Amino acid sequence: MSLSVEAKAKIVAEFGRDAKDTGSSEVQIALLTAQINHLQAHFAEHKKDHHGRRGLLRMVSRRRKLLDYLKRTDLAKYSETIARLGLRR
């Protein structure tokens, strides 16, 4: 299940440079983190959903790649983003 339009708009407003900034790395990382957190609750109940778990692993990998890119290009934004999201990197 994906995030609602309102939830996405809230995340974009919080992490984006303006209301329509959906492409910046910070926004993409925040959206992926919200989806990952939502899916973790799903997998606590549905342990045998292997097809869904593959999608979750793809999201985690994509978020990791975006975090690596952000760390390589702008260390200050990287540190701020992981602190705001509560990621342990």
Swiss-Prot record:
HAMAP family: Ribosomal_uS15_B. One of the primary rRNA binding proteins, it binds directly to 16S rRNA where it helps nucleate assembly of the platform of the 30S subunit by binding and bridging several RNA helices of the 16S rRNA. NCBIfam families: S15_bact (TIGR00952). Keywords: Ribonucleoprotein, Ribosomal protein, RNA-binding, rRNA-binding. GO terms for cellular component: cytosolic small ribosomal subunit. The keyword rRNA-binding applies. Part of the 30S ribosomal subunit. Forms a bridge to the 50S subunit in the 70S ribosome, contacting the 23S rRNA. The lineage of its organism: Bacteria, Pseudomonadati, Pseudomonadota, Gammaproteobacteria, Pasteurellales. This is Small ribosomal subunit protein uS15. CDD domains: Ribosomal_S15p_S13e (cd00353). SMART domains: Ribosomal_S15 (SM01387). One of its GO terms (biological process) is translation. One of its GO terms (molecular function) is rRNA binding. It comes from Actinobacillus pleuropneumoniae serotype 5b (strain L20). It holds the Pfam family Ribosomal_S15. Belongs to the universal ribosomal protein uS15 family.
